[in-house]
């Protein structure tokens, strides 16, 4: 036997050339073979011999095999090896390469000092730098178990169906198979007592056997009772599901809308993650999203403003420092840098219209949305103040009366453009912006490759500035318009176009939000198929009664 294994190992390590075209794909097939197969009778997992796997792979080049040996196993990438029925199933390939991070090499001891490093995100990030996450937003009914507790696993989605089934049945949210939902009111008291007395910690009770006193007779079995999957009580199913790792640990930090999820060993107290952290590192680790959103928004608006100031301040010189197209490119690249800067932490929305639209149409938490909008406005004010401080001398030299350079800081319709035309211009531009944002974030459509979302969105901003910026300046971001407008008013710009005309509200605010919601509705109505969008919601009976 040992000689056979040695021969197999020697032959396996020899560099050979694939003899057929299909042999080059055998590595991917063998990599998806489960390493464990569950035993249906005992419910345990038995190891599968890797000898057959080696036999499938022999004949491949040694360089390819060394690459295959360094690849992470499927389970580390979120693959499911066992189906819900307990049978072995083929793992599914990852949907997008941008879902996985490529970390730089780390020295020995770095992971001990930084136990949070390399952990996968436990919370969905609504990022503009990758496809948007999918959330279940429908109401959930939680049936009551016979002992009066809520059965979390048996929770069903509340849906109004045209062909209503039997009142005691509903459809599973995972497998689509019907099952019986039993509540306290639907179970007779005798059935409740029978279910409660059916199983104990040390044995299994017969259903109908009773002694002279009418008490159930138990047949005790040494060790713990191992009921079959069909007769397992809901509590044991939930516990087993948690033990198998299908649900994250129930730590307090997981219930907070903002915060960083540490490793389980850190959350349980086995490892002190703050041992090497100062007070600021502890604060940042607990609330990274607002800080990242602030930095990304401030940098993007600052770069865009300074690019526009460079062009407008040099417009009267013999050699202008660029043209209007230069300003458009500056805003596009600035937005791209902002997404690269904070897209992996906060999502880098940098726009209140985007945050509100994601909350309405994709389930972005409203509490986070309020915090994001507040942070975005603070960042825009800081960016406007910093941009003015950089160019204060040039502004006072070119425009000592503080009248002409105001259009550099905020959106202003031209004198001959009517209010209706300016409002319509803003609505159309915002709608196109959100259609493109949702299209890039839809993994069921045609998302770009890894790391390309930021570049495409930067081109989008540049294109919108090119095409819709002549009439009003194309202020598609309430934050990037309001913050610099406040700074312009504070430093001495007192023209009617600052706050007196009212455009600051019904243009960058009202028109942008209306256009964004319109664009989201159009995309979800024509393209998006996910159930998280309210466009795809079923109308509740209470809403129907209002129109009947």
From Swiss-Prot:
<feature type="topological domain" description="Extracellular">
    <location>
        <begin position="470"/>
        <end position="508"/>
    </location>
</feature>
<feature type="topological domain" description="Extracellular">
    <location>
        <begin position="312"/>
        <end position="327"/>
    </location>
</feature>
<feature type="compositionally biased region" description="Polar residues">
    <location>
        <begin position="171"/>
        <end position="200"/>
    </location>
</feature>
<feature type="region of interest" description="Disordered">
    <location>
        <begin position="76"/>
        <end position="101"/>
    </location>
</feature>
<feature type="transmembrane region" description="Helical">
    <location>
        <begin position="291"/>
        <end position="311"/>
    </location>
</feature>
<dbReference type="InterPro" id="IPR023271">
    <property type="entry name" value="Aquaporin-like"/>
</dbReference>
<dbReference type="InterPro" id="IPR022357">
    <property type="entry name" value="MIP_CS"/>
</dbReference>
<feature type="transmembrane region" description="Helical">
    <location>
        <begin position="328"/>
        <end position="348"/>
    </location>
</feature>
<keyword id="KW-0812">Transmembrane</keyword>
<feature type="region of interest" description="Disordered">
    <location>
        <begin position="1"/>
        <end position="63"/>
    </location>
</feature>
<feature type="transmembrane region" description="Helical">
    <location>
        <begin position="449"/>
        <end position="469"/>
    </location>
</feature>
<protein>
    <recommendedName>
        <fullName>Probable aquaglyceroporin-4</fullName>
    </recommendedName>
</protein>
<dbReference type="InterPro" id="IPR000425">
    <property type="entry name" value="MIP"/>
</dbReference>
<keyword id="KW-0813">Transport</keyword>
<dbReference type="InterPro" id="IPR050363">
    <property type="entry name" value="MIP/Aquaporin"/>
</dbReference>
<feature type="short sequence motif" description="NPA 1">
    <location>
        <begin position="351"/>
        <end position="353"/>
    </location>
</feature>
<feature type="compositionally biased region" description="Polar residues">
    <location>
        <begin position="1"/>
        <end position="22"/>
    </location>
</feature>
<keyword id="KW-0472">Membrane</keyword>
<feature type="compositionally biased region" description="Polar residues">
    <location>
        <begin position="77"/>
        <end position="97"/>
    </location>
</feature>
<comment type="similarity">
    <text>Belongs to the MIP/aquaporin (TC 1.A.8) family.</text>
</comment>
<feature type="region of interest" description="Disordered">
    <location>
        <begin position="158"/>
        <end position="270"/>
    </location>
</feature>
<dbReference type="GO" id="GO:0015250">
    <property type="term" value="F:water channel activity"/>
</dbReference>
<comment type="function">
    <text>Probable water/glycerol channel that may have redundant functions with FgAQP2.</text>
</comment>
<feature type="glycosylation site" description="N-linked (GlcNAc...) asparagine">
    <location>
        <position position="312"/>
    </location>
</feature>
<keyword id="KW-0677">Repeat</keyword>
<feature type="transmembrane region" description="Helical">
    <location>
        <begin position="421"/>
        <end position="441"/>
    </location>
</feature>
<keyword id="KW-1133">Transmembrane helix</keyword>
<keyword id="KW-0325">Glycoprotein</keyword>
<feature type="transmembrane region" description="Helical">
    <location>
        <begin position="370"/>
        <end position="390"/>
    </location>
</feature>
<feature type="compositionally biased region" description="Basic and acidic residues">
    <location>
        <begin position="249"/>
        <end position="265"/>
    </location>
</feature>
<feature type="topological domain" description="Cytoplasmic">
    <location>
        <begin position="1"/>
        <end position="290"/>
    </location>
</feature>
<feature type="topological domain" description="Extracellular">
    <location>
        <begin position="391"/>
        <end position="420"/>
    </location>
</feature>
<feature type="topological domain" description="Cytoplasmic">
    <location>
        <begin position="349"/>
        <end position="369"/>
    </location>
</feature>
<dbReference type="GO" id="GO:0005886">
    <property type="term" value="C:plasma membrane"/>
</dbReference>
<dbReference type="Pfam" id="PF00230">
    <property type="entry name" value="MIP"/>
</dbReference>
<dbReference type="GO" id="GO:0015254">
    <property type="term" value="F:glycerol channel activity"/>
</dbReference>
<feature type="transmembrane region" description="Helical">
    <location>
        <begin position="509"/>
        <end position="529"/>
    </location>
</feature>
<feature type="topological domain" description="Cytoplasmic">
    <location>
        <begin position="442"/>
        <end position="448"/>
    </location>
</feature>
<feature type="topological domain" description="Cytoplasmic">
    <location>
        <begin position="530"/>
        <end position="548"/>
    </location>
</feature>
<feature type="short sequence motif" description="NPA 2">
    <location>
        <begin position="477"/>
        <end position="479"/>
    </location>
</feature>
<feature type="compositionally biased region" description="Basic and acidic residues">
    <location>
        <begin position="38"/>
        <end position="48"/>
    </location>
</feature>
């Amino acid at each position: 036997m040992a000689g056979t294994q040695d021969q197999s190992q020697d032959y396996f390590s020899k560099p050979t050339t694939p003899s057929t075209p299909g042999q080059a794909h055998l590595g991917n097939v063998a990599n998806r073979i489960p390493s464990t197969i569950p035993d249906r009778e005992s419910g345990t997992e038995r190891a599968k011999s890797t000898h057959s796997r080696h036999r499938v792979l022999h004949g491949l080049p040694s360089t390819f095999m060394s690459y295959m040996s360094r690849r992470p196993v499927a389970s580390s990438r979120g693959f499911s090896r066992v189906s819900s029925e307990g049978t072995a199933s083929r793992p599914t390939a990852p949907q997008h390469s941008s879902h996985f991070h490529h970390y730089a090499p780390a020295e020995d001891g770095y992971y001990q000092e930084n136990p949070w490093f390399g952990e996968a995100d436990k919370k969905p990030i609504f990022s503009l730098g990758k496809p948007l996450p999918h959330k279940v937003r429908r109401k959930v009914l939680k049936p009551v178990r016979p002992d009066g507790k809520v059965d979390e696993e048996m929770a069903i989605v509340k849906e109004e169906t045209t062909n209503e089934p039997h009142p005691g049945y509903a459809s599973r949210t995972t497998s689509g198979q019907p099952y019986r939902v039993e509540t306290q009111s639907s179970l007779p008291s005798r059935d409740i007592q029978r279910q409660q007395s059916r199983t104990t910690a040390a044995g299994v009770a017969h259903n109908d056997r009773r002694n002279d006193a009418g008490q159930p007779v138990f047949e005790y079995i040494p060790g713990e009772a191992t009921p079959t999957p069909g007769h397992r009580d809901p509590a044991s199913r939930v516990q087993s599901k948690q033990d198998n790792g299908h649900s994250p640990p129930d730590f307090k930090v997981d219930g907070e809308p903002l915060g960083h999820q540490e490793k389980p060993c850190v959350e349980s107290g086995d490892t002190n993650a703050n041992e090497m952290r100062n007070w600021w590192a502890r604060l940042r680790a607990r609330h990274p999203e607002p800080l990242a959103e602030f930095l990304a928004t401030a940098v993007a608006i600052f770069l865009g403003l300074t690019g526009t100031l460079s062009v407008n301040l040099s417009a009267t010189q013999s050699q202008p420092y660029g043209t209007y197209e230069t300003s458009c490119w500056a805003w596009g690249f600035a937005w791209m840098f902002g997404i690269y800067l904070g897209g992996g932490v906060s999502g880098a929305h940098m726009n209140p219209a985007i945050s509100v639209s994601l909350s309405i149409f994709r389930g972005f938490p409203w509490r986070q949305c309020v915090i994001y909008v507040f942070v975005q406005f603070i960042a825009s004010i800081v960016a406007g103040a910093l941009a003015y401080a950089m160019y204060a001398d040039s502004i006072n030299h070119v425009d000592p009366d503080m009248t002409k350079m105001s259009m550099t800081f905020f959106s202003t319709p031209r004198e001959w453009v009517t209010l209706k035309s300016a409002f319509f211009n803003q609505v159309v531009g915002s709608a196109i912006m959100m259609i493109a944002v949702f299209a890039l974030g839809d993994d069921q459509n045609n998302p770009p490759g890894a790391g390309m979302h930021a570049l495409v969105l930067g081109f989008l901003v540049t294109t919108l500035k090119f095409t819709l910026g002549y009439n009003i300046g194309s202020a598609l971001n309430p934050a990037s318009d309001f913050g610099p407008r406040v700074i312009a008013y504070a430093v001495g710009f007192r023209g009617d176009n600052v706050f007196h005309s009212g455009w600051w509200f019904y243009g960058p605010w009202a028109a942008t939000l209306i256009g964004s919601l319109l664009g989201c509705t159009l995309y979800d109505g024509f393209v998006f198929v996910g159930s998280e969008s309210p466009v795809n919601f079923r109308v509740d009976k209470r809403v129907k009664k209002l129109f009947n």
